[in-house]
Swiss-Prot record:
It is an enzyme of class 1 (oxidoreductase). This is Anaerobic nitrite reductase AHB1. The lineage of its organism: Eukaryota, Viridiplantae, Streptophyta, Embryophyta, Tracheophyta. One of its GO terms (molecular function) is oxygen binding. CDD domains: class1_nsHb-like (cd14784). It comes from Arabidopsis thaliana. The record marks K138 as: Homodimerization. Its cofactor is heme b. Residues 8-157 form the Globin domain. Homodimer. A motif (Homodimerization) lies at residues 41-45, 111-123.
Length: 160
């Protein structure tokens, strides 16, 4: 939701996101890896989008380059969600957003890829905090993800 260019993220949504992220933060490397393994299980061809996985004989989950990448993606998604209400916008550095837009565009990321990643992210969070998970938490994380994706897509369109 947006109001005059500012994202509306309720206090309740913020509380759900902050509470769950505070529990997940310490395991962000493992959770990031789980997120990417889920993405690859749902859409195996996405592995080819990563140069370090494309021709590697090593299984993705054992690839030494995947874990740090996966962790940085997971942390960025979560930190962006936590800041959403406070700032009223996606708070990823502009240079990072530009880079994300350019790389997602270059590797042919389309709407379906973002949808797979959203599903995988929500499932990863649900499994990480099962005792906290609720329909409201799913909506909160889903909205936060959608705002991040909208910001990345805006940069993708600029880089085309």
């Amino acid at each position: 939701m947006e109001s005059e260019g500012k994202i509306v993220f309720t206090e309740e949504q913020e509380a759900l996101v902050v509470k769950s992220w505070s529990v997940m933060k310490k395991n962000s490397a493992e959770l990031g890896l789980k997120l990417f393994i889920k993405i690859f299980e749902i859409a195996p061809t996405t592995k080819k989008m990563f140069s370090f996985l494309r021709d590697s004989p090593i299984p993705a989950e054992q690839n030494p380059k995947l874990k740090p990448h996966a962790m940085s993606v997971f942390v960025m998604c979560c930190e962006s969600a936590v800041q959403l209400r406070k700032t009223g916008k996606v708070t990823v550095r502009e240079t990072t957003l530009k880079r994300l837009g350019a790389s997602h565009s270059k590797y042919g990321v389309v709407d379906e890829h973002f949808e797979v990643a959203k599903y995988a992210l929500l499932e990863t969070i649900k499994e990480a905090v099962p005792e906290m998970w609720s329909p409201e938490m799913k909506v909160a994380w889903g909205q936060a993800y959608d705002h991040l994706v909208a910001a990345i897509k805006a940069e993708m369109n600029l880089s085309n």
